[in-house]
A protein has these predicted regions:
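N-terminal amphipathic/basic-hydrophobic helices that include classical n-h-c signal peptides
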Residues: 1-20
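Glycine-rich, acidic/polar active-site loops that bind/position phosphate-bearing ligands
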Residues: 21-186
Length: 186
């Protein structure tokens, strides 16, 4: 219902907004659809985060994916903390095809994939609480001020005594040396 109302109001505006916002092209969408077909993907989890960073999402079938990528999926924003009051509950999500990945811990037969989504308001605007849009806005502001944003992963791990318990191998912490840090020579 929501998407029908939005599209009937301004289909051209909706399409223009999606194209401008995400710059997705048919090649990216076709790549995802081909991978879904070739890898026996049956369900796609459409992920987004709430205003405090908790992962949220809905699952759709492979048959619903093309429509979701080109038209969006309606969601009830009032059911998600911090998104909308009950009188302003209509929102929708649009999967980003560049984030498509098959979940490796799921079975290969009837596979499951995931995609992160853009969150839009009923007037086709980026939702202020969408963490992806917020990051883009802040990176643009930082760039306008002459800053460059750099990011890199920091890998951390723990050695455990065995695979049955979560008991650490030693009591060493940051910068500790022998005898507390038994794992030094591993």
């Amino acid at each position: 219902r929501l998407l029908s109302r939005l599209r009937s109001k301004s289909n051209k505006l909706f399409i223009a907004y999606i194209n401008q916002m995400t710059q997705y092209d048919s090649e990216a969408i076709n790549f995802v659809l081909r991978n879904v077909r070739d890898n026996d993907v049956k369900f796609i989890r459409l992920w987004f985060s709430d205003i405090v960073g908790n992962l949220k999402g809905v699952a759709i079938t492979a048959e619903e994916l093309e429509s979701a990528m080109t038209r969006g999926m309606g969601v009830d924003g009032s059911s998600i903390d911090g998104f909308a009051r009950s009188k302003e509950n209509d929102m929708f999500i649009v999967p980003d095809p560049t984030t498509f990945a098959i979940l490796p811990w799921r079975p290969k037969t009837n596979a499951v994939a995931r995609m992160f989504c853009e969150i839009l308001t009923p007037d086709n605007q980026s939702f202020e609480g969408d963490s992806r849009a917020l990051l883009r806005r802040n990176l643009a502001k930082a760039s306008d001020l002459g800053f460059t944003y750099y990011v890199a992963p920091e890998l951390e791990y723990f050695y455990l005594k065995d695979s049955k318990t979560a008991e650490p191998l030693d009591t060493g912490g940051y910068f500790d040396q022998d005898p507390q840090d038994i794992a030094t020579d591993l």
